[in-house]
Amino acid sequence: HHVRERGYVESPVRIAAIRGALEDAGYFRVVPARQFGLDTVTRVHDPAFVRYLQRACATVPEGKSLYPYVFPIRNQTRPPQELSVRAGYYCIDTFTPLNRNAFLAARGAVDCALTAATAVASGERLAYALVRPPGHHAERAAYGGFCYFNNVAIAAEALRRHGRVAILDVDYHHGNGQQQIFYDRSDVLTVSLHGHPNFSYPYFSGFEEERGDGEGVGYNVNLPLPERLDGGRYRRALRTALDRVAAFSPTFLV
């Protein structure tokens, strides 16, 4: 993950490769993303956090990137005034950059996710939002893991007005963002199948005992997997996840 030594792993080639495979399969028709207002983002993310990303990205010199380097371990009640220092107040790691394009790209990813959500809410059985940057590590007031806005959570929040929503996250890393955003809610089920946080990013969340809080107890399901497992064991874990989703009986699955 550490981009300074290994190169930037979240790159446009990922979008091109996935789109090429989908077009070859012939299951989807490509439609352009609609534009949605910033209020769709602030329904999920803290407005102060959103304003920070917008301001900070606009001030980074062209061709440069800003990485967080100081973190509020001792005092989280006083956000630093300097924008470059404040990156550490809002970021969960040291390798997710802010630059001139990050905020605009994150807005575009949200628009794409909401376009897919709107299509499904309007009657489409299936929609695939091909987005970058990704989003599942972004919490209500934090970015990281190359994620700035939580596209999945924003789509789920929009769909919630039309029925029950379940989120199934099968990325190798734990979906800490949607867990944190919906942790005390029972109207959105969050299920994550991922490498165990003992050895996998983001390390500090994704444990099996994290089941929700308050009204959300039982509506957050983590299925951490060992470092080594075969296909059979993975399929059994996936079946457990799917059974939990089915028991919730959602109107929409994100």
Where on the chain are the PLM-derived regions?
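HDAC/HDAC-like amidohydrolase catalytic core signature
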Residues: 1-254
